[in-house]
């Protein structure tokens, strides 16, 4: 497939660029047609009018002032309390400390109205039942609230061009790095336990399924969100989140009862201690001019976002089980926050994602870090001198740590329960109960073969011709698992993708793993 390195003009010409093998003109993503993260999503979704979410008894979402989108924090500002009824912020670090916006402390008293501080938004708080609260005090107290107090409408979608932008990182190219950034920043995979339980417990440690044993017994137990989804909600503007209570030192058990995210939780020196991770995304209505100074070095690239210099290490071609994000404050006066490190090795490393013809996000994850961490914890538990009955055991290494999953929305987590009288009980009507669950996880050598097929020029060329109806060959197609291949087209100002795929032959195997049907995605021609 020909290498495309320069964007084409609206007339279809390009500078030093050849057409793709299909013979049809393609339009490369440019800074004008790659979505601008949160701002483009909000404007395109709400369009200056009220939007109603699906489900019974769900209130309309008030229209956002498009001139003040910087006040909206998307997935929300988490303000967990130390104990029930406590008025303090258990996590200490304030929103303004992480973002540099405003000068207030983000107290729950409602007196702070600094720009960028979501605690100053008194009309954008929603409880678990979807009821809008009119004051900060109402929205940050009580047991029936979600941990996120500023959640977006459930129908927000990521930028339409992010699958295309993602594919442009296969070359160590600064333009492609920025295309990737523009289309994907704000869709960083964040693995968070589901919230909004009926019993108001919000987060449960047992909801986090990462063990190799669970994968063997039931592949659908893995609590993996699709790319850029948190609790089934897209993550366009999650600015800061916390690990919550971490596991006690040497115990090897996860004692998280408040939020836990799927990156490696560091061991702490004592019980009930907390640590945090800061995620910088386009939540404050950033524009193309806000992102600059992109530097590509080896397998890493850096860029400036507002007052931060963000560096992705080993991101263009990540090592197994390793992904680093370094945030460096450009304001030298903030010595204590000059450098923040995201977990260098998450529990699962993202390997690729696409959208099938049904609109479902399919992705590949690397679990080497998961099982390595578990083996280390098991070994520590077995040799711990503080435990008299230590029974740790190293988990067996999986023969292939790549896991393929098709994600779908768990309908049972978003439905209204009915009482005996036929009346609808609204306790389960929260739009935040959408939860993405893996439909199937493939972890066999069949996946390896399918990924290799993606890189086979002959396979790519053949499938592209078939997609455009130019290949009349009767050559039988390989029966191994095929992954998707994007082709760039133009549709109503955005890019559309053509994905090829087929089913994995052979049906179900004795291990309970069956083939995955990846039907071709049809090309959209909306112009």
UniProtKB/Swiss-Prot annotation:
Chain segments annotated as transmembrane: none
Superkingdom: Bacteria
Compositional bias annotation for Polar residues: 82-95, 128-148, 468-495
Gly residues bias locations: 500-513
Region (Disordered): 1-26, 76-148, 248-269, 468-527
InterPro entries assigned to the protein according to its UniProt record, in alphabetical order: Adhesin_P1_C (IPR004940)
Low complexity compositional bias, start-end: 9-26, 108-117, 248-262
Membership in a protein family: Belongs to the adhesin P1 family.
The protein's name in its UniProt record: Putative adhesin P1-like protein MPN_500
Organism: Mycoplasma pneumoniae (strain ATCC 29342 / M129 / Subtype 1)
């Amino acid at each position: 497939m020909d290498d495309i390195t320069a964007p084409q003009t609206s007339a279809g010409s390009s500078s030093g660029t050849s057409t793709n093998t299909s013979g049809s003109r393609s339009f490369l993503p440019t800074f004008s047609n790659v979505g601008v993260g949160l701002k483009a999503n909000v404007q395109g979704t709400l369009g200056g009018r009220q939007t109603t979410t699906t489900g019974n008894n769900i209130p309309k979402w008030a229209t956002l002032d498009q001139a003040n989108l910087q006040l909206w924090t998307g997935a929300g500002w988490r303000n967990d309390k130390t104990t029930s009824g406590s008025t303090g912020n258990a996590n200490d670090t304030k929103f303004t400390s992480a973002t540099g916006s405003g000068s207030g402390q983000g107290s729950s008293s409602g007196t702070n109205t600094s720009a960028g501080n979501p605690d100053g938004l008194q009309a954008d708080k929603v409880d678990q039942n979807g009821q809008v609260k009119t004051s900060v005090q109402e929205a940050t107290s009580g047991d029936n609230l979600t941990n996120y107090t500023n959640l977006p409408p459930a129908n927000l979608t990521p930028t339409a061009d992010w699958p295309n932008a993602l594919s442009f990182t296969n070359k160590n190219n600064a333009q492609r790095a920025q295309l990737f950034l523009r289309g994907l920043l704000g869709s960083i995979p964040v693995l968070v336990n589901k919230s909004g339980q009926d019993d108001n417990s919000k987060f449960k440690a047992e909801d986090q399924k990462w063990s190799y044993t669970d994968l063997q017994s039931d592949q659908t137990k893995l609590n993996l969100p699709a790319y850029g989804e948190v609790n089934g909600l897209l993550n366009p503007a999650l600015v800061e989140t916390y690990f919550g209570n971490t596991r006690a030192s040497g115990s090897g058990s996860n004692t998280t009862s408040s939020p836990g995210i799927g990156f490696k939780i560091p061991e702490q020196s004592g019980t009930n201690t907390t640590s945090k991770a800061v995620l910088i995304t386009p939540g404050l209505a950033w524009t193309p001019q806000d992102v600059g100074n992109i530097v590509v070095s080896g397998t890493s690239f850096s860029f400036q976002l507002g007052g931060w210099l963000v560096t992705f290490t080993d991101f263009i071609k990540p090592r197994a089980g390793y992904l680093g994000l370094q945030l460096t404050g450009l304001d030298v006066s903030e010595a204590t926050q000059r450098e923040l490190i995201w977990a260098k090795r998450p529990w699962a490393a993202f390997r690729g994602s696409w959208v099938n013809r049904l609109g479902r996000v399919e992705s590949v994850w690397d679990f080497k870090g998961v099982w390595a961490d578990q083996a280390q914890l098991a070994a520590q538990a077995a040799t711990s001198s503080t435990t008299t009955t230590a029974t740790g055991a190293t988990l067996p290494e999986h023969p292939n740590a790549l896991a393929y999953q098709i994600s779908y929305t768990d309908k049972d987590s978003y439905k209204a329960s009915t009482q005996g009288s036929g009346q609808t009980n609204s306790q389960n009507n929260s739009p935040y109960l959408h939860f993405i669950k893996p439909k199937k996880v493939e972890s066999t050598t069949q996946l390896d073969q399918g990924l290799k097929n993606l890189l086979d020029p002959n396979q790519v060329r053949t499938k592209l011709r078939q997609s455009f109806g130019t290949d009349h060959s009767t050559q039988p197609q390989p029966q191994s698992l095929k992954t998707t291949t994007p082709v760039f087209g133009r549709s109503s100002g955005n890019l559309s993708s053509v994905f090829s795929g087929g089913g994995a032959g052979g049906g179900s195997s004795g291990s309970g793993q069956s083939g995955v049907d990846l039907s071709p995605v049809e090309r959209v021609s909306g112009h």
